[in-house]
Amino acid sequence: VNNGIGLGTKLRKYREHLQVSVAEVSAATGIPESDLNEYEVELRPPSGDEILILADYFHCDFNFFISNEQLAPFEQTEILYRRYGSEFSKIDRWSVQEFLFLCECEEFLMSVVPILPRVEFRFRKTGTFYKGHGAEAAASLRRQLGYATNAVGMNVYSDLRKIGLHVFRRKLENSNISGLYVSHPTAGKCVLVNYSENVYRQRFTAAHEAAHAILDDGDEVIVSFMDGRNTERNYAEIRANTFASQYLVPPSFIKSIPNAGSWDTDRVLEWASKLQVSAEALTHALVDAGLVARDATGHLKTVRVPNNAKRDPELPSDLSPASRERRQELLSRGLSVFYVDLCFRAYEQGEISAGRLAEMLLVDETSLAELAQAYGKRLFYAE
């Protein structure tokens, strides 16, 4: 262990980011308060075991505490809470911390169990027409992923993972936050989608945050809000909305629909359901494609696809009600089928231990067996 220079500041800052007291850290880790106070003012360093315990508690790589390298998204969370601190409750701050931890884990797992071939995608912006950037980037990504002009992909999460983005859905207390993008120093581009939104809105948010990852990659942190604050004045937000709209509802596709210039509420409902987008998103796309006049969309936007008719691409339709409920609960904590499968594959191939598997799945070892059962997986030591 090094001499603890800077380690105390890291501990104190993490504690402040997560709004926990020294007493709370002590109660959770078993490290006496007096010792923690000494570590924070750098009177002496923690032991090696204590560093591991603290790294586990704060959901970060223990090497971050003992080296000067940027191994944790520390500066990014510092920016996040300095700019938007009042928007994030204590619970939501822990949710963000766990999300960033899952991104680190997924990046590691993809290096040892590369189950998804990564597609190299770079988009170079030219000129200052922001809306044009969004449209061109959406068309470019669709081409790169091999979509025909008249084809639409239904699993936006899978598409985004193919280009190396870490996409996790997580329920946040603040329902006004639709999503956020973080540039992680080791995991790369990370997208969080608020699971408290409806299924269609989550798809749009995922594509919107992906646009920030692709087009605003000079930014360390971007938070998007449901109330659309600053959207009218913020060209980057307009660009991200354009990207999301044209990725999920490509102009080339809607122009190929029979009688593409004739729309009523029933037809909007039918195609919004087929394309898994809101009626509002579809009508915006129709206007942008020049198929419907903007002043004729008022009644079309108000149509609502019933929530029970909305399909989630990451929830198989053949699940029993009990299994579906359990999977939804896990999804709301960030545990997608893709990520869970990745974790278990690494475990089955001997890349990680059962203890590390539990840690990566945000459960203790006693809950691991139950989670394995929910996903039809096996634990070797349970045999």
Give the role of each language-model region.
Residues 1-383:
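Active-site hotspot residues in diverse enzymes, especially metal/ion-binding acidic/histidine motifs
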